[in-house]
Amino acid sequence: MALSIKHPEADRLARALAARTGETLTEAVVTALRERLARETGRARVVPLRDELAAIRHRCAALPVVDNRSAEAILGYDERGLPA
């Protein structure tokens, strides 16, 4: 199967790589594609922090309430905010 890329920068980059490595144009392109695919395959997809925090927030909001006391009561603070 033939691959035809009509992009001036792609042509320039492929030729520069082939000249630097001593490979044919085809070898340079195939090697570059293999290396990029290997990097992408081994890399975990990065989830934006905002999305990750939203997922945590949704999971926490779905948890059941197991203690109806206020946070202060659970921590043992009195009406002045001091430990009781």
UniProtKB/Swiss-Prot annotation:
It comes from the Bacteria. This is Antitoxin VapB30. Antitoxin component of a type II toxin-antitoxin (TA) system. Upon expression in M.smegmatis neutralizes the effect of cognate toxin VapC30. GO terms for biological process: positive regulation of growth. Keywords: Toxin-antitoxin system. Disulfide bonds: none annotated. Signal peptide: none annotated.
